[in-house]
Every structure is written in structure tokens, then in C-alpha cells.
Amino acid sequence: MLIHPQFDPAAIRFGSFAIHWYGVMYLLAFAQFLLLGRLRIRAPRYQTLGWTYKDLEDLLFAGVLGVVLGGRLGYTLFYMPGYYLANPLSILKIWEGGMSFHGGLLGVLCALLWFAKKRHTSFFVVSDLVAPLIPFGLAFGRLGNFINGELWGRPTDLPWAMIFPMVDSIPRHPSQIYQLLGEGIFLGIVLWIYSSKPRPIGRVSGLFLLGYGICRFLAEFAREPDAFLGLLGLGLSMGQWLCVPMIILGVYLLRRNSTDT
């Protein structure tokens, strides 16, 4: 049985100034986006369209805004609408926590739509470029969750069960690690390999939606449901229900007829 190390929430301290682990993880996620994105734009499709490193920087800036705004609004709407309707100013208190991946994804989709319109290109050309870069960024986010000892798993007696002392003394699934490995590293490698060859437009995006939806859906069985929501219909969590439309849309994009590469 393992015990969570209870890391200092600050990665670096300079007197009273501290850089928290979340900040470090965000920076690493942004850096990998630019580094791997530089490799992605070397593909013939993007070379033909004249993509440059400046385009990646603009796309990252728009994506960050989408993640923050969408993630926060998604959390307020999907998870705690009653509380935030009664306390609307609390929506601005991002430092208190409360971000939704699915809301962040919707925010990123809006950012991609804006960027595609700005570049006079197809939305799926842009989303196919970005899709293989997202899982590795998510992996850093899940590592941040683990370091901070949050989003822990359900009780279990498996050999690798972990006690999170900040919660209780019950051995639990280290669900953050499951998600890091599944929707992060594994999905990232699959998408990177799949996208290394020319694919019909929308297929890479479809594989991301399907792959993330399945990985997250399965991981939720090991993750402790939100205390204020619990399990919903059919014994599924909110996260699992939000994955259902992702899986359906992913299957549709992978199966639709398209020969344009």
C-alpha cells in the first residue's frame, strides 16, 4: 500500500513569492504545444497552407483563453449551477478551484472556430493539427492533480492502492495516474502515430474525441464522484455522461465519407 507524499503546493519559493505546481504544469503544457506543434506544421498539408510558428503562437493564445473561460463556465454550469447562480461573483474566483475539462474543450472549439475563420480555412484542418497535442498537455494537468492530492479515486484493496492523508485513511485508486497514463500519454502516442500519415479531414479530430471519451469514461469508474453531485442516471458520473456525446461525435467523424486529405 502506498501513501501520497503530500507535496508542497509550491514548486519554487523566493521568500514570500511562490510558483505553484499548477503554474509549472501549465507552462510545461504550453511549451510542449509549441515544440510538438512545430513538428506538426511541417506536414505537407500545413506547409501548403503556409502555416508558420507565429500561427502556433496565435493559436495557443486563443486556446488558453478558451480553456480558462470555457473551463470555468463549464464547471459552473455542469457541476454547481445553483451555487453560482446564487453567488455570481464567485465565478471570477478561479484561484479557489473549479475547472471542467468538457467546458474547457467547448472553449477551445470556439477558439479554433475563430482561428479557422481568421485563416480562411476549414475548422477540421485546424482541429486535426491541434488534436495530437492536447493529450500530452492533459498529462501535465493530471500530474498537477496528483501532486496537489486532488481528484482522488474510489476505495480499493488493490496492491497499488494509495492513502491520501489529506482526505482520510482509506486506500484509494490513484485515479489521477490512471488518467495521466490513459487520456494523456497513451492517447497522445496513438494520435501522434495515427496523424503521422495523411488522413481524411476530421479523422484525427474524431479519433481524439472517441479516444478521450473512452479513456475518461473508464477512468471515472475508479475516480471518486464529486461529493455535491454523486452518481447520476444509470449509476454514471457527470464526467461519464459528458463523455457520451464525445464518443458519438468521434464515431461519426471516423465513419463519415471523406476523401479530402
Curated annotation (Swiss-Prot):
Give the way it sits in the membrane.
Multi-pass membrane protein
Sequence positions that bind a 1,2-diacyl-sn-glycero-3-phospho-(1'-sn-glycerol) = 142
Q: Which family does it belong to?
A: Belongs to the Lgt family.
Predominantly, its location class is: membrane
- What does the record give under GO molecular function? phosphatidylglycerol-prolipoprotein diacylglyceryl transferase activity
Described by its record, this protein's role is as follows: Catalyzes the transfer of the diacylglyceryl group from phosphatidylglycerol to the sulfhydryl group of the N-terminal cysteine of a prolipoprotein, the first step in the formation of mature lipoproteins.
Q: Its Enzyme Commission number?
A: 2.5.1.145
Query: Which species does this protein come from?
Result: Polynucleobacter asymbioticus (strain DSM 18221 / CIP 109841 / QLW-P1DMWA-1)
Any one cellular component term from GO for this entry?
A: plasma membrane
What is the name of this protein? Phosphatidylglycerol--prolipoprotein diacylglyceryl transferase
Per UniProt, which keywords does this protein have? Cell inner membrane, Cell membrane, Membrane, Transferase, Transmembrane, Transmembrane helix
Under InterPro entries, the record lists: Lgt (IPR001640)
Q: In which pathway does it act?
A: Protein modification; lipoprotein biosynthesis (diacylglyceryl transfer)
One Pfam family for this entry, by name?
A: LGT
Which compartments is it annotated to reside in?
Cell inner membrane
- Membrane-spanning regions, if any? 17-37, 59-79, 94-114, 121-141, 174-194, 228-248
